[in-house]
Amino acid sequence: MKSGRFIGVMSGTSLDGVDVVLATIDEHRVAQLASLSWPIPVSLKQAVLDICQGQQLTLSQFGQLDTQLGRLFADAVNALLKEQNLQARDIVAIGCHGQTVWHEPTGVAPHTLQIGDNNQIVARTGITVVGDFRRRDIALGGQGAPLVPAFHHALLAHPTEQRMVLNIGGIANLSLLIPGQPVGGYDTGPGNMLMDAWIWRQAGKPYDKDAEWARAGKVILPLLQNMLSDPYFSQPAPKSTGREYFNYGWLERHLRHFPGVDPRDVQATLAELTAVTISEQVLLSGGCERLMVCGGGSRNPLLMARLAALLPGTEVTTTDAVGISGDDMEALAFAWLAWRTLAGLPGNLPSVTGASQETVLGAIFPANP
């Protein structure tokens, strides 16, 4: 069983940067050693946003974007190696999630698409890459997401305490770690995605720092109720979603009924939408004693306060409180999934994704010996 230093690379739906994590991993523990966040050029970010919202592009443009993202991921890895004074030979493998540009796990031909050419990463780093983690699960009838609950269970499950782990990235997803029950997990709906999209269009800011805009506004209750009527929120698990569904176009369709509203009130309403949809799913899943939050949303004081208010019987905290950086959780998970793949161990949980069986995930892109 391969053990040693692994690197995890994650570029999530929030598009706030490429997260790169270095960790030592074996069958007994995962120990984070270092991390960095690598910026995504504005032009690349916009290209990804365009394709996620259904904008047409040529095969040539698509191929170029795939290559450019692969090079970006390689640059991020090499920056971490340089910072830590490490060589390619010091790393067992890179687990790279890729950039999701479309996720459609239901219908006639279920599929999910993550781009960022792994061959570029191997060629530019000299390190074996494990990627394409989601499509095997979909081939077995699953949603292909979320995959991180398996990692949450390995690291954070408790023998007696009822726990849930909430990742608030662009999309929010919940891991159910209830003693005596199969691990559960699903996407609750938008996390930071709509809030980020709105403030970017209205104020040119990538996100609402410290929820300043949202806290200056008031929740528009009719707008909130209108958005909460979306059928995704009442859909039973297993379920997963992404930017191809909850995007700026989705928000615009709801805002058509509310002309002339204060942009800060919209921001406050979007924050409340995230908090309400998460808390409702926590309660529908039976509740928990401790909700541990990670992802960019864990740094949003308004979101954290609203979750605590909406879940009065639950201790709402961050994963940092138990020694795991909330900013690095997903990248760390894909380093761990790469270790699982190389060890020939399954990486999915059918109780979470709905797949017909457990399976080894991903494709291996070996470096030259």
Curated annotation (Swiss-Prot):
Q: Which CDD domains match?
A: ASKHA_NBD_ANMK
Q: What is its EC number?
A: 2.7.1.170
Tell me what reaction this enzyme catalyses.
1,6-anhydro-N-acetyl-beta-muramate + ATP + H2O = N-acetyl-D-muramate 6-phosphate + ADP + H(+)
Q: Which SUPFAM superfamilies match?
A: Actin-like ATPase domain
Species per Swiss-Prot/TrEMBL record: Escherichia coli O8 (strain IAI1)
Q: Which NCBIfam families does the record cross-reference, listed alphabetically?
A: PRK09585.1-1, PRK09585.1-3, PRK09585.3-2
Q: Name one Pfam family in it.
A: AnmK
Does the keyword section mention ATP-binding? yes
Q: Which InterPro entries match?
A: Anhydro_N_Ac-Mur_kinase, ATPase_NBD
Q: Would the keyword ATP-binding turn up in this protein's UniProt record?
A: yes
A Gene Ontology molecular-function term? kinase activity
Task: Give an example GO biological process.
Answer: 1,6-anhydro-N-acetyl-beta-muramic acid catabolic process
Task: Give the protein's biological function.
Answer: Catalyzes the specific phosphorylation of 1,6-anhydro-N-acetylmuramic acid (anhMurNAc) with the simultaneous cleavage of the 1,6-anhydro ring, generating MurNAc-6-P. Is required for the utilization of anhMurNAc either imported from the medium or derived from its own cell wall murein, and thus plays a role in cell wall recycling.
Record keywords: ATP-binding, Carbohydrate metabolism, Kinase, Nucleotide-binding, Transferase
Record-listed ATP binding positions: G12, T13, S14, L15, D16, G17, V18, D19
Protein name per UniProt: Anhydro-N-acetylmuramic acid kinase
Q: Under which main EC class is this enzyme filed?
A: transferase
The family assignment reads: Belongs to the anhydro-N-acetylmuramic acid kinase family.
